[in-house]
Amino acid sequence: MASPQENCTTLDLIRQHLLDDNVFMEHYCPQPILYSQSSSSSESLNSIASELNNETFSFEPTLKYADTAQSSNLDISSFFNNSKTEFDSFEFETKPNVSAARISSNSPKQTSFKERKPSLNIAIPMKQQEVVQKVEVVPTEKKHYRGVRQRPWGKFAAEIRDPNRKGTRVWLGTFDTAIEAAKAYDRAAFKLRGSKAIVNFPLEVANFKQQDNEILQPANSGRKRMRETENEEIVIKKEVKREERVPAAAAPLTPSSWSAIWEGEDGKGIFEVPPLSPLSPHMAYSQLVMI
């Protein structure tokens, strides 16, 4: 009885001859034939292919197989059916060897699904979109006012030409806004030219008149009060000058003085005679008075 390896080789040769598949030997031949000589695998394949081309097909293997099956008169159809069942019995043993050898030679070592490392689920953070609010800038209309010009640093200067000084410029000041500078120009123009002045805000000329009157009235009233107080002080300080009367010196009693007294009409001259002074060294002489 032939060994299982010999039966397998015969079946493989028959299938190769019938199907004319050159790659069949690399995949379905048992391991001892294909991989016994690992160093000279290419040479063995070439030699097997040349032998198959030179040999003629014979049914000797079929006869051997018929002897084992104890049937001498076996047609080719029964042979293939029996060979198929016989090949299926050996397929379980040969396929794992061929696949294992093929995997080990051609592909890298494969691990089982359980031995694989679990895949990492890395959540990529979403990119935060910054919301930029666009500020709509409303374009403001720049109006040019008469007598106003803007400085490079943003301030507004007001000037006016004085007709009394041959058109020389008069500086009115620097302001934060153009409207304030225009109003300052209107006030100055109204003071210089009156109702003939060309102003930026003609409807506010009446306000300028009221403001000027309010400014002038307190100033005039204050001046009048100052003058009145000065006059009062001057009147108070003026005093009437009174001259002191120096009494006349008492004349000595002489016959002439007595005659003057007696000749008086009132008769009071007698009683107004100065008394005789006891201190006087001379009798009938009054005391001398030093003036």
UniProtKB/Swiss-Prot annotation:
Q: Name one GO biological process term.
A: defense response
The cross-references to CDD domains, in alphabetical order and at most eight, read: AP2
Query: Which GO MF terms are attached to this record?
Result: DNA-binding transcription factor activity; transcription cis-regulatory region binding
Gene transcribed to yield this protein: ERF5
- Tissue expression, per UniProt? Expressed in roots. Not expressed in cell culture.
- What family does the database annotate? Belongs to the ethylene-response factor family. Class 3 subfamily.
Supply the name of the protein.
Ethylene-responsive transcription factor 5
Annotated domain remarks: The AP2/ERF domain binds specifically to the 5'-GCCGCC-3' motif. The affinity of this binding is higher if the seventh amino-acid of this domain is basic.
Which residues form the DNA-binding region?
144-202
Q: Which SMART domains does the record cross-reference, listed alphabetically?
A: AP2
Question: Keyword Transcription regulation on this protein?
Answer: yes
Source species, please? Nicotiana tabacum (Common tobacco)
Subcellular location as annotated = Nucleus
Q: PANTHER family this protein is in?
A: DNA-BINDING DOMAIN, ETHYLENE-RESPONSIVE TRANSCRIPTION FACTOR ERF105
One Gene Ontology cellular component term attached to this UniProt record is: nucleus
Q: Could you tell me what this protein does?
A: Acts as a transcriptional activator. Binds to the GCC-box pathogenesis-related promoter element. Involved in the regulation of gene expression by stress factors and by components of stress signal transduction pathways mediated by ethylene, that seems to depend on a protein kinase/phosphatase cascade, and to be influenced by methyl-jasmonate.
Induction, per UniProt: Strongly induced by ethephon (ethylene-releasing compound) in buds and in leaves. Also strongly induced by cycloheximide, mechanical stimuli. Wounding leads to a both local and systemic expression, independently of ethylene, and through a de-novo-protein-synthesis-independent regulation. Wound induction is reduced by methyl-jasmonate. Induction by purified xylanase from Trichoderma viride (TvX) and another elicitor from Phytophthora infestans (PiE), that appears to be mediated by a protein kinase cascade, and to be negatively regulated by protein phosphatases.
Which UniProt keywords are listed?
Activator, DNA-binding, Ethylene signaling pathway, Nucleus, Plant defense, Transcription, Transcription regulation
Q: What is its main location?
A: nucleus
